[in-house]
Curated annotation (Swiss-Prot):
A single MF term (Gene Ontology): leucyl-tRNA--protein transferase activity
Main location (coarse class): cytoplasm
E.C. numbers: 2.3.2.6
GO cellular component, one term: cytoplasm
A biological process from GO: protein catabolic process
Reaction it catalyzes: N-terminal L-lysyl-[protein] + L-leucyl-tRNA(Leu) = N-terminal L-leucyl-L-lysyl-[protein] + tRNA(Leu) + H(+); N-terminal L-arginyl-[protein] + L-leucyl-tRNA(Leu) = N-terminal L-leucyl-L-arginyl-[protein] + tRNA(Leu) + H(+); L-phenylalanyl-tRNA(Phe) + an N-terminal L-alpha-aminoacyl-[protein] = an N-terminal L-phenylalanyl-L-alpha-aminoacyl-[protein] + tRNA(Phe)
Places the protein is found: Cytoplasm
This protein's name: Leucyl/phenylalanyl-tRNA--protein transferase
Length: 204
């Protein structure tokens, strides 16, 4: 991957961020308390084909039971706080204060969205990502109750398909995401997929 600091680590304007996504680049930080931000352009990119998403049987059962209430864009601050508060296996997080502010601005102008799982009136899990054209760039997810974030991911894939999106970018792949059909594609192939996704517009 390539990585370099932006001109001003404290300011990432929405226009700059969207231009970066349009060219296959996204920002990260080393840790939550590190004020610096760097740009990342991986040699291999994680994607989940919307027509190749796999839902494990146990999760299918959870979805059928309707344990969680799914909401969209109702609590952005709560979702990014949940994602930034690493616990357990996710004790470290890359979401620092400049990144929080940057994505809050994107949310305000309609280019950042959340999928939220609510249980008994409380936010139990969720995810957020960036939309541009017909692409959704998944950023992070969290869970406070078993399967909450997985249900959000399953809902996201269904929702994106309904709304006409053609690309779900996960940035990297993990064993967890591979269970759902995530795969790695070389940078050139990814950039071709991204170019096609940016040719149209889909509404989240």
């Amino acid at each position: 991957m390539t990585a370099e600091a932006p001109p001003d680590d404290d300011i990432i304007e929405p226009e700059m961020l969207l231009r970066a996504y349009a060219t296959g680049i996204f920002p990260m930080a080393e840790e939550a308390d590190d004020p610096e931000v760097f740009w990342v352009r991986p040699e291999k990119r994680g994607v989940i084909p919307l027509d190749g998403f796999h839902i494990p049987r146990s999760l299918q059962k959870t979805i059928r039971q309707g344990i969680f209430e799914i909401r969209l864009d109702s609590n952005f601050a709560g979702v990014i706080e949940g994602c930034a508060s690493g616990t357990g296996e996710r004790a470290r997080t890359w979401i620092n204060e400049p990144i929080r502010r940057a994505y809050a601005k994107l949310f305000e102008i309609g280019h950042c969205h959340t999928v939220e799982a609510w249980y008994e009136g409380k936010l139990a899990g969720g995810l957020y990502g960036v939309t541009l054209g017909r692409a959704f760039f998944g950023e992070s997810m969290f869970t406070r109750k078993r399967d909450a974030s997985k249900v959000c991911l399953a809902y996201l894939v269904q929702h994106l398909s309904r709304q006409g999106f053609v690309l779900l970018d996960t940035q990297f792949t993990t064993p967890h995401l591979e269970r759902f059909g995530a795969l790695e594609v070389p940078r050139k192939e990814y950039e071709e997929m991204l170019e096609r996704a940016l040719e149209g517009i889909a509404r989240f």
